Amino acid sequence: ALGRDIMRTVGFDMARGRLDVSLHPFCGGAEDDVRITTRYEKGDFLNALMGVVHESGHALYEQGLPRAWHSQPVGAARGMSLHESQSLLMEMQVCRSAEFMAWAAPVIAAALGGDAQAPEWSADTLHRQVTRVRPGFIRVDADEITYPAHILVRYEMETALINGRMALRDLPGAFNDRIHDLLGLRVAEDRLGCLQDIHWPSGSWGYFPTYTLGAMIAAQLREAAQKACPTLMEDIARGDFSTLLTWLRAHVHHRASSASMRDIVRDATGAPPGPDAYLRHLRHRYCGE
């Protein structure tokens, strides 16, 4: 119930989609039947909730594509970097913010039978939990600071394999060495290392960089939306996502594939995709700058 309530709040049309459970969160389906999933872990409800808002970002993009173009190539989403920007904007930029947690904390406490006045259910506690930085083995569970290291390792590994610089049999050792170099962790078994993702066995080679590109674009879009709509985060703090969704519909979703990703981002933000807004976001959230 909590996940579906949050989906409705961010703008998901429940008449055109649904939420289910899977081992790995994903978004799929068709234009008027957009289905998302999340996974549940005992002792960590926030992980499941962040999975819901992440996949809801993907789903909102799909539900926002122009109906008149549904049967045409121009009506498709404009590539996975932009798609990941929509999920990461919703999850990282918005739903891990202090403003969102100010609204969500009492909603979460009520849904899970907690005392909204108790410190463990406070907005500050929940915000600290979802922005905690701690290196770990699993990419999908990584925090916002260490996540790019997981992507860098995978990018280095797949380019070395494709270019013939590394044999497949050497992948586990090379993968583990780079995880230790970047995160200081010793991988004990391959299921925590090079075998944890579905991308390579499913043929999605070269996909991993779209997550970092998406994170950069998400920060750039959120910054532009904030500039255009100064009350944006105040609205979020009241549980009102209409300002954000209206802006995204006009500047991203309704564009579909009518222009390149680069042009869509430039038109929406005034600049081509770049790292500046992303770095400002990280410094502000984690360094207080």
Q: What are these model-derived regions, one by one?
A:
Residues P73-E84, T146, W205-Y211:
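Active-site metal-coordination segments of metallo-dependent hydrolases
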Residues I151, Y155-E289:
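C-terminal, non-catalytic "cap/extension" segments appended to globular domains
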Residues N47-R67, E84-L88:
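Active-site recognition of the HExxH zinc-binding catalytic motif
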Residues A1-F45, L279, Y286:
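Contiguous, non-catalytic segments that form substrate-binding/exosite surfaces or channel walls
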Residues A1, I6-D20, G114-V153, L185:
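All-alpha helical catalytic cores of prenyl diphosphate-utilizing isoprenoid enzymes
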Residues A76-A118:
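Post-HExxH zinc-binding segment in Zn-dependent metallohydrolases
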Residues T37-K42, A68-G79:
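Short helix/strand-bridging catalytic loops that position acidic/His residues to coordinate divalent metals
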Residues A15-R16, A68-H70, R96-P106, L168-R169:
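Acidic/polar loop patches that form or flank catalytic/metal-binding clefts of enzymes
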